[in-house]
Amino acid sequence: MPDVVALAAELLSINSSTGAESGAVDFVSKWLVARGWNVTIQEVSRGRANVWASRAGRGVTLSTHLDTVPPYIAPRLDGTRLLGRGACDAKGIAAAMLVAADRLAAAGEQRVDLLFVVGEEKGSDGARAANRLAPTSRFLINGEPTESKLASGAKGSLRVTVRTRGRAAHSAYAHLGESAIVPMLKLLPTLETLDLPTDAILGETTVNVGTLKAGTEANIVPALAEAELMFRLVGDVEPLRKQIDRWAKGRAELEYGSYIPAQHFHTIPGFDVAPVAYTSDIPLLGRWGTPLMFGPGSIHVAHTPDEFIEVEELRGAVDAYERIVKTLLSA
């Protein structure tokens, strides 16, 4: 059987930033074909593709993403840790899934599929494409760094752009203009007055003012100010949208952007369980079966210069994926 740490290091040595995943796709597909899997390469866009590997189907699909955020960071072993871009998000997870599925197949279990998508870190176009395939699995185990716990659910997200307008003028005659920044600075602190929903499992809805843009030069009264908000959702979005509409009415313009609903996931006995605050491809893979989320590593080091995964946890993830699959198939 292949060594999961060596396999993860091989995957990490391939630069597969979002939009340039072809090297990782080629590596994974060849690895699977060499081990007797039926492999489907699904084109997502020019030069980019998902990998779907199957045998008998009608069971459990192990899935994660092959793309990473930039910049590329080469892998290295440092004591008990494997470091590098994608170590925990999510190439280490992909390696653990590959080895677990291969061990199951070698033991005669044919009801395991593998799905590796591109584009998760930016727009999830790979998952959207994968949901147009014709899977037969009953369960989907999505791999994200959950610290080797089964996720009980995941917060959703809602992007909102807020705009305030003024009237441009030369700053020497500022009284002839109207700064768009002033009403924005008055409005944003009142976000604290919103009655944000809570959920017994997912916790509190949160809001982050992610960007604030206004003006072009210090000697110009700015005519436009723009803030981008990110709400992390724990329930139905419509009551929150109505609150936001009332909050901004008469004071700002709103533009609603991407929306991902909050999710509750299937769990099984024998594992620690906890919710996660981040989103994933799960809402876009509805045809792949009842969702679970599990993976080694911590989201708190993902996307950082020192991203890592503990070698012991990575090895343990192979056993954990096998155990989850066997439990689901016996249900």
Feature-to-residue mapping (PLM):
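Acidic/His- and Gly-rich active-site-bordering loop/insert found
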Residues: 1-87, 109, 293
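Short, surface-exposed alpha-helical segments at coil->helix boundaries
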Residues: 22-26, 94, 241
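Structural motif corresponding to alpha-helix initiation and N-cap regions
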Residues: 46-48, 124, 278-279
